[in-house]
Amino acid sequence: MKRTTIHISAAIALLLGLAACTQDEAGFLPEGAEGTPIVFTATGLNPAATATAGTRAPADGNWTGVQSVAVMMDGMVKTYNVTPSTADPTSATLTSTDPYYWTNHNDITVTAWWPYTAGETTPPAVKVKANQSAQKDFEGSDLIVADGQTVTYGSPTLRFTHRTARVTIVLTDYTEGLASVQLTGLSTEGDNPAEITPYDKGSNTYTALVAPQSVAGWR
């Protein structure tokens, strides 16, 4: 009886080994409770030369201050927390307490965006604020998206880009304190404002975020 038991155990081990090989060849990961949690690296924000002094926000290519982003896969949206890199805050790590999981090595398609309002199932349309004279309203007019990107198992990177356009105005030959700057003649498509009061970033420079368009003029 002992010899029979040994032979049966060996046969079971052989079958398990064959099953593991078949699973690996098919591209599936070793079995776990749900798989391996997906952790993303967020990149793509451009630290423009016109970055606003004193601000730390996506508008200036910086993830510092961003708490979370929306991440959509297969029609489902989950919240991922943002941890900016201490060495390079233009990149960040995205993790979640309720993550998506890798169940195999196949590529996945992901859309992500910021800012995110609970209940959104797709990235919102670009809609900027009419009065961006306050820093929070300038920064709050931004929209960054990683749209329908292919993410690989070995390099789960999301490259975000700005959906807004940035207009910067530098004043010369004027008396300080007497200037009033206003962007006018803007497209109102998507319920965007026809006029925008820009943010005074100092050094005779004003900046604003607008929906992508040709700027007709300002005063």
Give the ranges of each region predicted by the language model.
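Sec-type signal peptide cleavage vicinity
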Residues: 2-11, 18-219
